[in-house]
Amino acid sequence: MPTRLLCLCLLSITAVADAADHLRDLQTAAIKNGQSPVAHWGVDPKNYKEWGSHSNRLIPVYTFGTLGAGEGVDLNSYLGKNSAYRSEAKLKTIYSRVPSNTLNLAAEYCDQTDLAALQRAAFKAGKKHVILMVFDGMDWQTTRLAAIYNERRVCYSEGRGTGTHFQNYTANGTTQFGFMSVAPLNDGTDCDVDTQTVKNPGGKHPGGYNVAKGGAFPWSPPSDDIYYLTGRGPDGKGKGEHPYPDSANTAQAMTSGVKSYNNSINVDYAGQHVPPISHEVQAAGFAVGAVTSVPISHATPACSYAQNVDRDDYQDLTRDLLGLPSSSHSMKPLQGLDVLIGGGFGDTATKTGDAEKKTQGQGKNFVPGNIWLTAADRNTIDVANGGRYVVAERTAGANGRESLLAAADRAVSSSQRLLGFFGIGTAKGHLPFATADGDFQPAVGRANKIESYTSADLTENPTLADMTAAALMVLDKNKKGFWLLVEAGDVDWANHDNNLDTSIGAVNSGDRAFQVITDWVEQHSDWNETVVIVTADHGHFLWIDLPEGLIP
């Protein structure tokens, strides 16, 4: 081959490779250089990773099976003229007060607690299946990030947009779009997990939403007080007017309808238990379940069913989820979920050494070993030992998808419950992170670390889509119906790491799970008897500066 032609071929191959991993290169350069012309996290465009936590941004809501479904089920029951933020009385019901600068007579947004009201209204209206899908940490900007990459074009600058299945799917004309405030009741509440008590009801930093500072829409540009949405003062120091939310309080708002303090798991401001929807519908004969790509009793899946004053009491939260005696239900355990599938496998710690920080929130009854599920509890719930759960867990040499679906089939045929326990112990128990181009080779992030996975990590774990399919198999055996929470938790983990590459991959992984849900509805149900809500619990603080730069 002539030298010139060989060089051209090599250049062409290199260009294809670069295009195929464009986001990895973009992310790697951003971390190396400390800035990127394409995007940044925080208030300073010249500091790519200025902020690595949550924000108080308004969050998009996508509903399916709701348009024209009647008062309380139709999303418009809570938007625009019906917004709680236009009414002092409604704000007092939500916050027990009218927070500073939170009344907004022009508000188009609803409150996060309205999603619980919508779910309850759906069951009251006779719906058989209600599914709440939470893309943890996925604000409007994160969705747009993935949509631009997927579409290979800048296709919108406001509104619902296109580029993912949950944006494009119409559910036979029954889909709706809106957005909500996710402000917490307060931050700074101190708790005692051993006594399950709140030490300072009301905390130290009351919540609310100031539209003049936060914006009227999820896509609003920054205000003059750019620090407001991150809970900081106007100069970036100290406490701002309102705190940003965490994943516990925000999940609880959607599962119970009660706004509470950051770190709460289905308890009110004073630590008193509040019933999540799952308890109510389970008592009425429905099946209930939770699925997540992160550990099984992380904040969002914990809020599907458990009750605890602190989100970090992981082992006790898992006990609630599985119907075992816990610190919050020691005398009368909860019934437990019918299906629980998620991560946490292999994530272990003791009370000594470097691992102590992983156990601090768990109280005196922490059992050294797996942080999320003790060996004794795992054995107790297994049908092999007289328990109620068919257990599928990561097993050396076994295909994770196949073992989980086989266990789901056994659970259906034997009328048993299902526990799926997977993950990577060296990666805090989560499933492998997919990246923008669909491989599993994450780029470096805020922590200046790169996760790497073995072939066993990839084959021995199912995907979130696989987990969702297994959950639907088991829950569908209850002919009365079911309630299900599905969490794409890795979106939040990617955004905490200021990682564009894994953020897109996480959104798309979750989107594939949503595709499983819509396929199931079309094949086994319809949009007259099923309601699905897709949303996030909270956002982060990503800004896309040059959207065209995301296109390979």
Which residue stretches match the model-derived regions?
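Short, conserved helix/loop micro-motifs enriched in His/Cys and acidic residues
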Residues: 248-265, 301, 492-494
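A post-motif C-terminal structural segment
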Residues: 20-75, 82-85, 96-107, 123-124, ...
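Hydrophobic h-region of N-terminal signal peptides that target proteins for export
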Residues: 10-18
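Sec-dependent signal peptide recognition
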Residues: 2-8
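A short, compositionally biased domain-edge/stem linker segment
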Residues: 107-121
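Glycine-rich anion/phosphate-binding loops
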Residues: 267-273
